[in-house]
C-alpha cells in the first residue's frame, strides 16, 4: 500500500520527485560499492578456485619403470606448468602376506593424496624408504614399524598411518618419491620378477589447454 502512496505523492509534487533523485543515486552507488567489495573479498578457498579453475590435470606418459630404476626424463619445462608431482603406482609383495598390496609413490602430502587419504597417526614420509600404510595393512603385519618388500628383502620404515577415504579396508602403501628407485635390484632381476610401476604426472597449469597440446606433441598422449 505504501508503494501506491509514494507513487501518488511523486506524481502530485515535482519537488518530491526531485528530492527522490539524490536518494536513488545514493542507493545506486551503495549497491555498486557493495558488489565490488563482495567480488574482491574472496575466501581463501574461493581465491584458489578462481586462480586454478580447471587447470589441474594428469598426464600418462605411457612409461613403465622397473624397480631399482630411475623414472624417465620428460620435457616438463616446455609444458609451462606451475607445479608437477610425479606419481608411480603398482602392486607389490609384502613379506608375510599372501596377497599383493597397492603401492603408490609421490611427494606427500600432495594433490594425489588430497581428499583420498587422511593422516591418522605419525607423519608423512620425508625421505626415500619412508612410508605410510593403511590400518588394515599395519594390522596384517602385526603392528610393526618395518615392512619388507620381496624380492630383495627391501626394508621400508613405517612413519605413519593413513585412512583411505573410499576403501577403508584396503591394504595400501604410500611411499616418498625415490623409494622405488632405491629398491636393491638390478634391471635384470626386476624384469624377471615383473616388478614395474606405471608412471604418471600430476600437474598444475594456468593454461591447461596449451599444456595438454604440448604434452600430446611431446609424448603422443592426451591429458587425463
Task: Give residue ranges: language-model regions.
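Membrane transport/envelope proteins' first extracytoplasmic loop
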Residues: 3-224
Amino acid at each position: 500500500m505504501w508503494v501506491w502512496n509514494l507513487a501518488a505523492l511523486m506524481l502530485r509534487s515535482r519537488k518530491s520527485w526531485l528530492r527522490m533523485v539524490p536518494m536513488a543515486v545514493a542507493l545506486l552507488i551503495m549497491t555498486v560499492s557493495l558488489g565490488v567489495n563482495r567480488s574482491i573479498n574472496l575466501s581463501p578457498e574461493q581465491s584458489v578456485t578462481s586462480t586454478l579453475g580447471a587447470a589441474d590435470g594428469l598426464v600418462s606418459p605411457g612409461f613403465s619403470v622397473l624397480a631399482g630404476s630411475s623414472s624417465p626424463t620428460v620435457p616438463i619445462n616446455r609444458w609451462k606448468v606451475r607445479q608437477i608431482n610425479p606419481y608411480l603406482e603398482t602392486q607389490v609383495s609384502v613379506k608375510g602376506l599372501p596377497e599383493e598390496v597397492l603401492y603408490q609413490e609421490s611427494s606427500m602430502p600432495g594433490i594425489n593424496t588430497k581428499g583420498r587419504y587422511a593422516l591418522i597417526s605419525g607423519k608423512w614420509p620425508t625421505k626415500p624408504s619412508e612410508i605410510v600404510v593403511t590400518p588394515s595393512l599395519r594390522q596384517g603385519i602385526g603392528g610393526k614399524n618395518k615392512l619388507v618388500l620381496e624380492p630383495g628383502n627391501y626394508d621400508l620404515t613405517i612413519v605413519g598411518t593413513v585412512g583411505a577415504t573410499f576403501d577403508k579396508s584396503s591394504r595400501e602403501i604410500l611411499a616418498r618419491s625415490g623409494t622405488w628407485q632405491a629398491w636393491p635390484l638390478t634391471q635384470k632381476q626386476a624384469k624377471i620378477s615383473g616388478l614395474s610401476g606405471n608412471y604418471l604426472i600430476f600437474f598444475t597449469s594456468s593454461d591447461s589447454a596449451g599444456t595438454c597440446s604440448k604434452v600430446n606433441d611431446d609424448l603422443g598422449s592426451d591429458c587425463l
